[in-house]
Amino acid sequence: MKVSLRILVVGIAVLVFQSCKKPNAKINSQNKIMILGDSRVEGNRPDYESFRYELWKNLLDNGWAFDFVGTNYDNAKYPKHLGQFFDRNHEGHGGFRVDQILDGLEYYIDEAGVPSIVIFGGVGGNDALQGQSTALILSNTNAVIDYLQNVNPNITIFIDQLPPARSTVMTSTLWAQLDGIHNGILALATAQTTASSKVVAVDCFTGFDDSYLEEGDDSHYNETGAKWVADRWDAAMDAFYAGGKWSN
């Protein structure tokens, strides 16, 4: 069922988005990738890492042609790779729940353009920690997928079955909810896939452990963890496209 977007863009957030925005050199590619999610997408180098940089390197190494798009711009320092500067545009928002991402989607796409591929990470993490029910998390996630498919009926959406927080904060209740979210994401991916728009669930939790988290941080990646998660996204994308290469 298609869910209409609830128009709610907080003015302060809009100003922050605009102030963080910087123009990247134009990349001649129709493969527009929006990496969407929470602080695990946004990152805050050097305090903690996003998987975006490592995924960008993987995609370059594999010969993909693409352009990261989004209203946010990463101002941290990153080494060049294969002679190219890191494509810093993204749509990660620290602390956001899925409903807050849903509320911002119209603005993000109006400003950044319609993506052909969305990588939706950190789905349900802040929501669960803030006491939202699994049913509400999945309903909001379903609405995000609905909106994206409405603006681009041919969109491909990769969505994570998110990694856990540090084991010391994962109560039995949170573990049970995480399992419910994972199962729900898998079911949503199947139910929301159409003839022209594929939704792919990506296992970013099996094998994840505390060594992938920043020291003294209960939920954010260190460099090793960011690389591990990026490799999961990359493997899922490579498998989905059967080793083919996107062309400009």
Model-derived features with residue positions:
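Active-site-proximal beta-strand/loop segments in catalytic clefts of secreted hydrolases
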Residues: 36-40, 44, 69-74, 121-126, ...
